[in-house]
Amino acid sequence: MHNNKFKLDIPLLKKWKSLAGSMFITFHRAFDVLINPEESLEQLIELGFDCVLTSGQNENAIDGINNLKSWNEKFGLQINIMPGGGIGIDNCKIFKAAGLSSIHLSGSKIINPIKIPKEVNKELSFLNQPLKDSDTNILRQVVQSFKFS
C-alpha cells in the first residue's frame, strides 16, 4: 500500500483499483503512517478510491478528531473519511457531531479464554492477548446512537 518512503505506492494502487473495477474500495489504516496525508487523500481521490479508514494518524480516532474533521471538510465530498480505532458507545456521537457520516469499530467484548490444542504454536503473541468477540448488543447501541444523534 505504501512504499518504504511512507508514501502511497501509486503503481500498485492503480493495479488494485483496476482489478476492483466498479467495486467500492476502501484504503485502510496504512493511511495513518503516510507522511503527507492531504497529498495522499488527493491521490486516492484521483485513483478512484471511495473511502479511507483512518484514526486521524493517531493511536485512536478520538485523539485524531481534529485531523478527521479537517480532512472531511476539505475532501469529504470526494472521498468518505471513515474514523476507526477506539470507537464505541461512549464516543461515537462525537464523530457524528464533527460531521463524519460513518464510523468503523469492532463492537467487541472480551470473552473467556479457550483451550488451545497442543498442535497450535502457543508462542504466537496474539494468543497471549485477551480473546474478543463482536457483541451484537454493543453494535446495536452504537448504530442507534450514531444514526439518531
Feature-to-residue mapping (PLM):
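Glycine-rich phosphate-binding active-site loops on the catalytic face of alpha/beta enzymes
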Residues: 1-5, 49-62, 100-120, 130
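C-terminal helical cap(s) of enzyme catalytic domains, especially alpha/beta-barrels
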Residues: 65-74, 94-98, 112-149
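Short, basic, helix/turn surface patches
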Residues: 25-29, 78-87, 128-141
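A cross-domain feature marking catalytic cores of carbohydrate-active enzymes
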Residues: 1, 27-31, 56, 83-85, ...
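Catalytic cores of alpha/beta
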Residues: 12, 32-47, 69-83, 87-105
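Histidine/lysine/aspartate-rich catalytic loop segments that bind and position anionic ligands
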Residues: 12, 16, 22-62
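Glycine/small-residue-rich loop that forms an oxyanion/phosphate-binding "nest" at active or ligand-binding sites
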Residues: 1-14, 19
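Short helix-capping segments at alpha-helix termini
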Residues: 20-23, 74-78, 148-149
